[in-house]
Amino acid sequence: MAEETFEYPLDEERAQKAYDVLVKYLALSARSEQECKNKLYDKGYHKNEVEYALERAKKYKYIDDAEYVRTFLLFNKNRYGAKKIAYKLVNEKGVDKKLVDNILLDNLDDDYQIESATKMAQKYIKQKKIVDKSGAQKVGAHLYQKGFDWRIINKVMTNLFDVFEED
């Protein structure tokens, strides 16, 4: 016997309450569409009520995943590399991978990532009091944990640890 999904008729009052809950949730902080959807389902709203609330919020531009990604990137590009930012947006926030990749490609060039990774590495070296090449592996691992690509890490390591050799 094939399983059929029961489609609830749209209850205008519940749909309005779902929208009100969503607006309050969005008032606290910007959220991705998936986070909003999960919140409404967790509150017990049905699919059509959730869709109504989401569409209405999109209409008023309360939910815009592209703008959310740009804002997230603005606040996190100095803390993480592109890979970690993409991971957080796609896996934790539920944003479409293609959208994330396109915006990251447009906004994070290699030069910026190298500069950012260099600053992070210098800060880490200073905090851990690394004075020679023996600590290079720890610095590389730290940058990798922060989400930088190996290509970027290798360039930064070459620049930083060539300086150590000259001293």
Where are these regions (language model features)?
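An alpha-helical, amphipathic repeat domain used for nucleic-acid recognition
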Residues: 1-167
